[in-house]
Design a protein with these regions (language model features):
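C-terminal scaffold of the Radical SAM
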Residues: 1-170
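Residues at alpha-helix caps and immediate loop-helix transition turns in enzyme cores, especially N-
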Residues: 16-20, 175, 209-210
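Structural signal for well-ordered, non-membrane alpha-helices
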Residues: 74-78, 184, 210
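A short, conserved structural fragment
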Residues: 87, 184-194
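Basic, amphipathic "hinge/linker" alpha-helix immediately C-terminal to the N-terminal HTH DNA-binding motif
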Residues: 145, 198-203
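Short amphipathic alpha-helical interaction segments
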Residues: 169-184
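Short, amphipathic alpha-helical interaction segments positioned at domain boundaries
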Residues: 203-224
């Protein structure tokens, strides 16, 4: 048994809310195992970037619009309780795609990268395939391993406090909790006795939150 998964790119020029809602409805109608969703990135030198420069295409950077499109796509995907948010950029059908290799990698397990652009680590050695002729290897420090795990578990909408206590030391946990309290006040996170759970808006800003909290904790530790 296999899984059929799709990538959905949103926030392209002149895209309407109806477009992202229709994309979500198609994914559900076809019972696709999972949909990864990403805001459009315009790469320098691409045809789109040249068309924008030549003013053939109008492309406005509007974070409110980006979030509005994201929110409507997610809301439609979750309507009916057939799908759930599996990871910051992936919504999966219940009983479908389990994203096992990402779960292994993000919790500190060994994953050996093969294709160009792939990255992973094996027994504390980081590996990155830069191109078909060159690979980059690095020895991971104890801090790098632990904070990579922290970044990894923050790729998921529910962050287990037990997992955090297995990664962070007592003082680091205190600083982490300080930042989570700040996020909760902003409506990005909800806390209970066992977990921190990202809200829909928190998932949208998830990678920013992850980077922000890691920098905050490390600055508190090293800048005493």
């Amino acid at each position: 048994k296999g899984d059929v998964c799709v990538d959905i790119i949103y926030n392209f020029p002149e895209q309407k809310i109806e477009d992202v809602v229709e994309d979500a409805k198609i994914v559900k109608k076809l019972e696709i195992s999972s949909a990864s969703f990403y805001s459009l990135m315009v790469h320098e030198g691409s045809k789109l970037s040249k068309d924008i420069e030549a003013e053939k295409v109008k492309m406005e950077e509007d974070m409110k619009r980006d979030y509005l499109l994201y929110q409507h796509f997610v809301d439609e995907m979750l309507r009916g309780d057939e799908y759930h948010i599996l990871e910051l950029t992936k919504i999966a059908r219940n009983g479908g795609d389990d994203y096992k290799y990402i779960k292994v990698r993000n919790t500190g397990g060994d994953t050996f990268p093969i294709g160009v652009g792939a990255g992973g680590s094996v027994h504390g050695i980081g590996v990155y395939r830069m191109n078909k002729d060159m690979s980059f290897y690095s020895q991971q420090t104890e801090y790098h391993e632990r904070f990579s795990k922290l970044s990894g578990i923050m790729q998921f909408p529910v962050i287990s406090k037990e997992s955090l206590s297995n990664i962070l030391k007592e003082e680091e946990l205190k600083y982490f909790a300080e930042k989570m309290e700040e996020y909760e006040e902003k409506g990005l996170v909800k806390e209970n006795d066992d977990n921190y759970t990202l809200t829909t808006e928190g998932v949208f800003w998830g990678n920013n939150l992850s980077g922000d909290v890691i920098i905050y904790v490390m600055e508190k530790i090293f800048n005493k």
